[in-house]
């Protein structure tokens, strides 16, 4: 009876060869392919409410990014000891702790932006994006991958917020990066630009209906780009 030999090339797969594609996939999923705002359409309430300029949009985006990264890391770190039956309340407590920390930091170092964002900073606790990534990804994957997933998802939301905020600020006020120094410091005053010299901007752009119209335009552009690929 002859023995069949398995070619060595069939089992020549190492984690090192696969690992780079994992990081790339997590990044592209979070920023573009599975963007929490433009694909999943999650967290629209704060997105539409505070994106009337770049400063507010960037402030909320960075806060959400930090919360996603921190909570994903902590939940993944303790995923094996968190009881399955009460995991959701525990996730909410972890998220609330991270949000409170970010809220206190914003209150201390970026108070004008904190005042402008108002209730939408503490409402990050109830954001479907944060609890969704905790349940769907962080509770099932390694700490490093979970932290990077939180960063990528947060970055995708931040970019969406900033683009929408820029469109609304330009059309509504004719400026770009106005008040950014309130978030990033006095050096950011040099970034302010007057793009449209109008007696009065289009008020609709900085009102809630303008947010819906702007988001619809961004979604349309993304769909066109995806179809051409």
Swiss-Prot record:
| Gene Ontology cellular component terms for the protein in this record | plasma membrane
- List the EC numbers from the record: 7.-.-.-
The annotated subunit structure for this chain is:
The complex is composed of six subunits: RnfA, RnfB, RnfC, RnfD, RnfE and RnfG.
Biological role: Part of a membrane-bound complex that couples electron transfer with translocation of ions across the membrane.
Q: Which InterPro entries match?
A: NqrDE/RnfAE (IPR003667), RnfE (IPR010968)
> What is the source species?
Glaesserella parasuis serovar 5 (strain SH0165)
Q: What class of enzyme is it?
A: translocase
An example of a Pfam family matching this protein is Rnf-Nqr
Q: What is the gene called? A: rnfE
Q: Which family does it belong to?
A: Belongs to the NqrDE/RnfAE family.
User: What parts of the sequence cross the membrane?
Assistant: 58-78, 82-102, 105-125, 147-167, 201-221
**Per the UniProt entry, what is one GO biological process?**
electron transport chain
Q: What domain of life does the native source organism fall in?
A: Bacteria
Membrane topology, as annotated, equals:
Multi-pass membrane protein
Keywords per UniProt = Cell inner membrane, Cell membrane, Electron transport, Membrane, Translocase, Transmembrane, Transmembrane helix, Transport
What is its subcellular localisation?
A: Cell inner membrane
State the name under which the record lists this protein.
Ion-translocating oxidoreductase complex subunit E
């Amino acid at each position: 009876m002859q023995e069949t030999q398995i070619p060595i090339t069939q089992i020549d797969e190492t984690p090192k060869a696969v690992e780079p594609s994992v990081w790339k996939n997590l990044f592209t999923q979070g920023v573009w392919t599975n963007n929490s705002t433009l694909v999943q359409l999650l967290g629209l309430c704060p997105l539409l409410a505070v994106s009337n300029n770049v400063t507010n949009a960037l402030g909320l985006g960075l806060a959400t990014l930090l919360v996603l990264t921190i909570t994903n890391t902590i939940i993944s770190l303790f995923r094996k000891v968190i009881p399955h039956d009460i995991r959701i309340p525990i996730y909410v407590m972890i998220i609330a702790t991270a949000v409170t920390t970010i809220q206190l930091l914003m209150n201390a170092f970026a108070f004008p932006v904190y005042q402008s964002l108002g209730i939408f900073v503490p409402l990050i606790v109830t954001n479907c994006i944060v609890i969704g990534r905790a349940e769907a990804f962080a509770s099932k994957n390694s700490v490093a991958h979970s932290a990077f997933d939180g960063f990528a998802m947060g970055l995708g939301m931040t970019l969406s917020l900033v683009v929408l905020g820029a469109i609304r600020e330009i059309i509504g006020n004719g400026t770009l990066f106005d008040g950014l120094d309130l978030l990033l410091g006095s050096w950011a005053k040099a970034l302010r630009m007057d793009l449209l010299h109008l007696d009065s901007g289009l008020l609709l752009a900085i009102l809630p209906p303008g947010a819906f119209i702007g988001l619809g335009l961004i979604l349309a552009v993304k769909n066109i780009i995806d179809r051409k690929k």
